């Protein structure tokens, strides 16, 4: 298969305690807000996938149902630390390096290094 695959993830829905504070967190780490009302926030990731934040009861101490990838993991780790977040130490794996950070709802989000170079 040449070029991009013909399918991709369109939306991921996350139940949150507070849509406003959650949207602020995700915007702060680099997502673009594309829709907002009192009951939902839609944020766009690179590649066009949308994270949809809706009121809900997030499970205590849960992993987010997705992970994110960034171009420069070390730079991202430092930048998020400077924002006052508390990223875990970076772990260097065989395929990815990664760290975790908690969002305002307690979801543990894994942040991976990218293994793709160039536009995706």
Question: Across the structure, where does each feature detected by a protein language model lie?
Answer:
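A generic local structural motif
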Residues: 1, 28-29, 53-55, 86-87
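Vicinal oxygen chelate
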Residues: 1-5, 8-17, 41, 57-120
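Core segments of cupin and vicinal oxygen chelate
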Residues: 6-7, 13-50
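Conserved short beta-strand elements that form part of the metal-binding/catalytic scaffold
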Residues: 32-64, 108-114
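Residue-level signal for secondary-structure boundary sites
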Residues: 51, 74-76, 119
